[in-house]
Amino acid sequence: MIDTTIFQDKTAVYYTLGCKLNFSETSTIGKTLKEAGIRTARKGEKADICVINTCSVTEVADKKCRQAIHRLVKQHPGAYVVVTGCYAQLKPDQVANIEGVDVVLGAEQKGELMNYLGNLEKHPQGEAITTAAKDIRSFSPSCSRGDRTRYFLKVQDGCDYFCSYCTIPFARGRSRNGRIEEIVEQARQAAAEGGKEIVITGVNIGDFGKTTGESFFDLVKALDQVAGIERYRISSIEPNLLTDEIIEYVSRSRAFMPHFHIPLQSGSDDVLKLMRRRYDTALFASKIRKIREIMPNAFIGVDVIVGTRGETEEYFEDAYHFIEGLDVTQLHVFTYSERPGTQALKIEYVESPEEKHRRSQRLLVLSDEKTKAFYTSHIGKEAWVLMEKSKAGTPMHGFTDNYIRVEMDHDDQLDNQLIRVRMGGFNEEGTALKGVLV
């Protein structure tokens, strides 16, 4: 049993890098510490505890993590510093050797962070406590409110896919999940707190159910029945796991929005094989067609990686033309970053940084064209928009069911409200459509 009396009136600062899943987990850690009497430090206040939740998706992410640790150690002298997350799991000794770090916790230990605070006495040398990826078994449920109106609900963790370029299975372990009844209860709690929108998050959420004998489709149907939650968004789902059954259900669902985020990674079948992805372009195209047939106005976001090992100019051109022909809304373009220990390093063909940048820019231009065309097609139409809080005197923003960003004049009473809006032209920045109350 932890003696929490030593934590009374202590303060903590939290810093999160990376994905929405990390933000959800940090929020849960914060709630646990709050229950023990530790409050979040105010802006500019020196904290007693620093919790840093890291990312390691790219080499740049690793660098940002190190910079964040150094910065927080400097800003909060004498604070007890805990580092967790993917970078901590993959390179624990490297993190432990950073001056000022006290404890490094791996994926298995993250959910029990309270147990590693001790009496908050600084360590002369950072201590790394991790579990090998193959032995990571725990699943820590979390549901957090983002900076705006959305809650992020963690339903699954880990991945069994072992794509050639990716370290996530080594950072988060094998695929595992919570039980539907537990997850539904968290959604009910979000509704009780006034939440109206939930984003379903995980590492490979379509793989949900592997550890409980349930299915992602079962989860979707159960969540759709939670009173008070007006909107659900599926954060990202593998194309081979996005079944017609799920697509059809979303099209007639009470609360699941016509909004999909589907990782393509490459539009070249040759590159997909090198990546060890579990689908080809024909399957991906069939999923897009299926969505468009029954939800013509759906927002479809697509992840693409450029410059992977083995991606020749010919393969990239194949990929570009395939993506150009897809009826999708937006591309999330990532430049390939070599990760230690991945199978991709065995592929000999390597592109220059300059060529990677050129390819990235071409796809970003294509993405802008597709997004602008999608927004333009909705000018003059009416839609329900969930508004988000903004600073006084600044425009307010919100999103339609199909994820079009709408800008409105400031009105505090609109915060977290669903309002009927007619969409006009673009705002000055070209990032949203101007809305007028109907």
Outline where the language-model segments fall.
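Proteins enriched for Cys/Gly/acidic motifs involved in redox and nucleic-acid/cofactor modification
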Residues: M1-T201, G206-D207, K221, E245, ...
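Conserved SAM/AdoMet-binding glycine-rich loop
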Residues: V81-V82, L90-K91, A192-E314
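Short flexible coil/turn linkers enriched for glycine and charged/polar residues
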Residues: G146-T149, C159-D160, F256, S266, ...
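Hydrophobic, well-ordered secondary-structure elements that form the walls
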Residues: I262, D303, I323, L331, ...
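Contiguous mid-protein beta-loop-alpha structural module that forms a pocket-lining wall or clamp
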Residues: E311, L326-V328
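Short, acidic/polar
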Residues: Y315-Y320
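Short glycine-rich, low-complexity segments
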Residues: T329, T342-K346
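Terminal RNA-binding accessory module
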Residues: K346-V438
